[in-house]
């Protein structure tokens, strides 16, 4: 969200609801609980003396302050471990960790003392500690609140396979840099995030009949002398790859994208729209972890046929660009503005937003282009 919309919500949070009369201390407590992670010692008195409206206005309109003390504390958590180029090592440890847990569950492994490693378990534990440090120590409380808000809005389940290793990067490299920016940019970033694409199975969503290049090469007839052993090994590898490869469209991400991330459950879309969105997003995948992960578009997997979403036509042959056009359509749809604005009002103003709050937020969204 641009700060214009947040400013409106912040001022609403600092103002008593109609028919209510709050003391200066109560107003200060309310705004600190909404725009920050609660009051620090002595802060209720200082905000009450300044005035909750004035404090909220300054918080939302001033430039984001440098925070050297927080930066010093963050450095203790080795931020590099949350970046993409450190992912291959974490994923290898995740694979070993998964094998150990599977063996333990099946009774095959002897009981062993916990191992302190740099794997996903330790990374997640440190990442959770870092979140607490930021929430309690950051001068820019609004950014931390928005990171928390968007992390919940664009939920990723950390106990699904690779997402144990991908989640920290998702929050640090996808959510955090865009937490105070335009919604369209954030929606696109999450749509291209390996954590999201893996969690909701879009990495396995391909057009019907699609054959990945590595499988196509193995399926080609070979000429020349071929030892029997090599031929058997090749056939075995081909069979394993064919068994693991996706075979068609997966609608999981398409449905969540519309129902939770943008339009809302009552956003006016149909099952046909879900299928068409899934077709548009075929080929949106991720690089292999041993190559550093990151978004990767697979043209071989994309459905190049014509599609229609919410009455809008997407001509045949649109490729990756039609996915970006889809995100733009969803991000700026009136239903999305209403759905996301209601959630923002519930977070920043009141659990049950007062009359007019959502409509005011939508108008601010329109005025600032999200």
Please place each PLM-identified region on the residue numbering:
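Bacterial N-terminal signal peptides
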Residues: 2-13
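Sec/Tat signal peptide C-region and signal peptidase I cleavage site
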Residues: 15-19
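Mature N-terminal segment immediately following signal peptide/propeptide cleavage
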Residues: 20-48
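Structural motif
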Residues: 20-27, 137-142, 248, 268-269, ...
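Short, hydrophobic/amphipathic alpha-helical patches that form generic packing surfaces
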Residues: 30-39, 134, 152, 259-263, ...
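Conserved catalytic core of Hanks-type protein kinase domains
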Residues: 34, 59, 189-190
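N-terminal accessory alpha/beta regions
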Residues: 41-153, 158-169, 173-178, 199-203, ...
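Active-site substrate-binding loop specific to GH73 endo-beta-N-acetylglucosaminidase modules
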Residues: 127-128, 163-370
């Amino acid at each position: 969200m641009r700060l214009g919309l947040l400013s409106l919500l912040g001022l609403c949070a600092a103002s008593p609801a109609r028919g209510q009369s709050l003391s200066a201390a109560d107003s200060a407590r309310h705004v600190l609980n909404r725009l920050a992670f609660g009051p620090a010692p002595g802060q209720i008195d200082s905000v009450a003396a300044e005035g909750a409206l004035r404090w909220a206005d300054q918080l939302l309109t001033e430039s984001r302050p440098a925070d050297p003390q927080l930066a010093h504390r963050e450095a203790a958590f080795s931020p590099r471990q949350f970046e993409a180029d450190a992912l291959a090592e974490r994923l290898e440890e995740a694979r070993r960790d998964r094998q150990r847990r599977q063996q333990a569950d099946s009774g095959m492994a002897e009981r062993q003392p916990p191992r302190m490693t740099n794997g996903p378990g330790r990374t997640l534990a440190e990442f959770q500690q870092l979140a607490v440090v930021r929430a309690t120590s950051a001068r820019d409380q609004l950014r931390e609140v928005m990171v928390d808000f968007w992390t919940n809005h664009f939920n990723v389940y950390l106990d699904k396979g690779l997402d144990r290793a991908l989640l920290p990067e998702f929050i640090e490299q996808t959510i955090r840099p865009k937490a105070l920016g335009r919604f369209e940019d954030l929606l696109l970033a999450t749509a291209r995030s390996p954590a999201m694409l893996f969690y909701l199975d879009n990495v396995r969503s391909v057009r019907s009949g699609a054959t990945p290049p590595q499988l196509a090469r193995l399926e080609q007839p070979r000429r020349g002398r071929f030892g029997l052993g090599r031929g058997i090994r090749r056939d075995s590898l081909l069979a394993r790859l064919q068994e693991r490869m996706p075979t068609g469209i997966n609608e999981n991400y398409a449905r969540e994208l519309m129902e939770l991330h943008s339009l809302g459950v009552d956003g006016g879309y149909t099952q046909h729209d879900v299928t068409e969105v899934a077709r548009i997003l075929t080929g949106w995948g991720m690089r292999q972890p041993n190559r550093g992960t990151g978004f990767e578009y697979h043209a071989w997997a994309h459905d190049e046929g014509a599609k229609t979403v919410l009455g809008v036509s997407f001509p045949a042959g649109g490729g990756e660009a039609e996915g970006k056009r889809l995100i733009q359509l969803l991000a700026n749809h009136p239903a999305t503005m209403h759905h996301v604005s209601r959630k923002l009002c519930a977070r920043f103003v009141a659990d049950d937003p007062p009359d007019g709050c959502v409509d005011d937020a939508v108008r601010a969204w329109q005025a600032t282009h999200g």
